[in-house]
Amino acid sequence: MKVLVAPLDWGLGHATRCVPVVREFLRAGAEVELAVVKANANFFREVFPELRQRLAPSYNIVYPKHGYNMALWLLKNSMHLNSVMRYEHHFAEEMVDRHGYDVLFSDNRFAFYSKRAYSIYMTHQRRIAFPRAFAAFERIGVMWHANIMRKFDEVWVPDLEIYPGYAGSLSHSGATPGDKPMRYVGTLSRFSDWDAGENAGNALGSALGYVPAPVDLERDVDLMSVSEFMAHSANVEWNAASEERASGKQTFGMRALGMRAAYKVVAVVSGVEPARTQFEQQLREALQQIPGQHMMILGKPSAEQKTWIEGNIEFHTHLATNDFAEAVKRADFVVSRGGYSTVMDMAELGAKCIFVPTPGQFEQIVLAHDLSKAGYAVEIPADELSAETLAIAFEKSVKMPKVEKQNLLHDAVENVVRRFKERSI
C-alpha cells in the first residue's frame, strides 16, 4: 500500500501532527511518501530522513496584522483560495496517475483527494469559529466545510470523542461528512513516542547527531498550470542516506552546545508572517527584562540550524524533535502560540503553558480562552504581551492535562489497511 501524506502549509503545526500518522502507516507496512513545501521540508527530513519527499503546491497564505480583519480577509481572498483548491485537486489526481498512490492523506488540504485513491481528510475544526461581530458567517463556514469533507472517503478528527476533549466545540460540533465515515483518532503529537529515559538530548541517534542540511526547493510554488508544475517538480525528491551524510557535515546536538540544566522560560515562535516576526520581537523585548535564563526557538526549519546567545537568552533557529522535548521538560514555563498542534504537544509533554494567540486566528483565541478557563494554561492577548504580564502569569498554577495512552489512531490506520486488502482481493 502506497501512501502520500500532505499537510497544509499554514504554519508548521499541520506538519508536526502528521508525524504520528506517518509512523502508524509505516508500522502497518505501508510505503509512505511526503508532499512538502519549502517551509516544512527540512522538518520532515529531520524526523523522517529515509522518506521520499515530493514538492507540493503552497497555499501562500499571509495573515492580516489585526484580528478584526480576518473574516473580511477570508471573503476578500476567497477567489484565490478557490483557485488554489482547483489546482490542488488537479495536482492530486496527477500524482496518483504518475506515482500510483493507493491512499492520499490530507491534513486540512481542502482539495487533496482523488477518485482513484482512498482519500482521507483530517481536521480538528469541524466548527470554523468567527468573532462575535461576524458570527453570521459561521453557519456558512460550517456548510462550506461539510461540502469539502464529503469529497473525501473518510474524515479523521485529532481529538478524543468524548466532549470536550482538547479542542472543545471546535472538534465536537459543526460540519459532518454526510454519509462518509468520521473517526476521532485521539490527540496527535510528534512527542507521543518520545521517551525521556532513552531519547532525551538524542536528536538523531547520538548526542552529536547528524542533522540533514537544508533542502533547497528553489522557490515557493506559484499558481502555474498543472503541467508546468509537474514538469518543475517531477524529480524534486530526496532519499535518506545520500550525499549530505557522505560529506561528513554535522551539526552539534544541544548537549554538545552546553544545554542548561533549567530555563525560566522556553519561548516557541511559530506561525505565518507577519505575525511570526512580530511575536519574536515581542518575546525578545520581554525576556530581556525578566531575570533568569531563557531559550527562544525561532521556528525556522527551512533555515540552517544555528545556536547563539544574546544576554540571558539562548537562541535556536529550530530544534530536532527530541531536543525540543528536552528543552520543554527543563522549562518552568513555555510561552507559545495557541495552535491546536501546540496544545497537543504541550499536553503530551506535561508543560506549564502561557498561550499568546495569533491575532486574527480566532480558533487560537477560543482554544486559549477555554484552556485558561479550565485552569490548564494562562492566556495573554498578543497586544498585552510584556515582561509585566508574563510576571503575573508566572504566579498562576497551571498544567496541561495528562494525555492517556490511546489506540484510536492505530485502529483508524488498521481500518484503512483492511479496506485496501479487501479492495485488492
What are these regions (language model features)?
Residues 7-19, 274-277:
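A short, glycine/small-residue-rich beta-strand->loop->alpha-helix junction that serves as a flexible
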Residues 9, 27-78, 241, 314:
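Conserved nucleotide-sugar phosphate-binding/catalytic loop shared by glycosyltransferases and other
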Residues 15-25, 40:
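Short amphipathic alpha-helix
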Residues 51, 115-185, 190, 209, ...:
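Active-site-proximal region of nucleotide-activated glycan assembly enzymes
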Residues 69-111:
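Conserved nucleotide-sugar donor-binding subdomain of glycosyltransferases
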Residues 190-242, 247-333:
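Donor-nucleotide binding loops and adjacent catalytic segments primarily
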Residues 207, 221, 226-230, 392-425:
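C-terminal amphipathic helix plus adjacent low-complexity
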Residues 323-366:
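A donor-sugar binding/catalytic signature common to diverse glycosyltransferases
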